[in-house]
Amino acid sequence: MEPNLQFWISERQAFFRRFCQWMDLLDPVNMFISIGSIEKSRQLLFTTEDAPKHYLDNQVIKDAWNKSLSTVHPDSSKLIPHLFRPAAFLPVTAPMVFLLMMPDTGIKSIILTQGCLYGYTTAFNITNGNASYSHGPVERTLLGAGVSVSSTFIGLIPHLFQMKYPPNNFWLKRTLPIVFLAQVSGMNVFASRSFENHRGIEVMDKEGHVVGHSRKAGRKAIKDTAKSRAVLFGTSALAPELFIHIFKRTRFYPQTLLSLVILRMSSTFFMMGLMVPVSFSMFPQIGQIQCSQLEEKIQSSTEEKELFYYRGV
């Protein structure tokens, strides 16, 4: 069995432990791990008996797991491209969210930032989603292009609306783009990973033996990931607005434009740094579903009451 898949099946731990694991996996250093180092770490995991059980009590094994989990896809056993590894998500998206939430930004700047943000998140979702369904590179490329363009267009709606009908209410002006950012980010996951819902993903027993392909499991995997992504971007954009609004009422509020920009940037980066591991930890990487909730063909092919599937990041 693929070591990463074996690890996530055996490690269905509580939220706090998942959070601590993601804090390790999101270390930016993991973007630059060499292929040789990855192969050496995975060889150690292959040759170590019950390697998942030694994650906490053996530092060498723990380091090997962190290198493997942060760079290799659990479904395909292929290396994840450097730019789309989980560790790259925060440093790539945080500056975009900051620029997107800057007040009084021109429409050209908004279009460029939206395009970059949704172009990246679409590719990230496809790369780190479940890869057990049948697919080809051309159809995935066409799907990704369509999703990124449509997400960018939908994300522009509140900005275009405010340009034509400027709202008098401050909170409506500032929160409407945030609501759209959260909603479109969730919809982006649904759209970019729609093949999982239409074609089904592998469901397996606790030993990792594949029982069949389930569209219902694919739908659940996408739904959970979409929720976490909406929470991530919605909270990361809303919290700095609340902080700055409250801070304005104090005597410590800076008056220079540069100080205001630095304050907004710091609060946005802080919230993104907190919410990325929180959102990735909201649901286990290996989802669990009752066999009775799946298709009749799968129910008739196994006696297991609970089956597992890879949710994706």
From Swiss-Prot:
Entry annotated with the keyword Transmembrane helix: yes
Any one GO MF term held by the record is: monoatomic ion transmembrane transporter activity
Predominant subcellular localization, coarse grouping: mitochondrion
Q: How does it sit in the membrane?
A: Multi-pass membrane protein
Looking at the UniProt record for this protein, which Gene Ontology cellular component terms does it annotate, in alphabetical order? mitochondrial inner membrane; mitochondrion; nucleoplasm
Lineage: superkingdom: Eukaryota
Q: Tissue range of expression?
A: Largely restricted to kidney, brain and heart.
* Annotated transmembrane regions: 87-107, 141-161, 175-191, 230-247, 269-289
Q: List N6-acetyllysine occurrences by residue.
A: K173
Q: What's in the keyword line of the UniProt record?
A: Acetylation, Amino-acid transport, Membrane, Mitochondrion, Mitochondrion inner membrane, Transmembrane, Transmembrane helix, Transport
InterPro entries xref list: Mtc
The subcellular localization recorded is: Mitochondrion inner membrane
BP GO terms, sorted:
amino acid transport
The entry sums up its family as follows: Belongs to the sideroflexin family.
What is this protein's function? Answer: Mitochondrial amino-acid transporter. Does not act as a serine transporter: not able to mediate transport of serine into mitochondria.
Q: What is this protein called?
A: Sideroflexin-4
Q: Can you name the source organism?
A: Mus musculus (Mouse)
The gene it comes from is Sfxn4
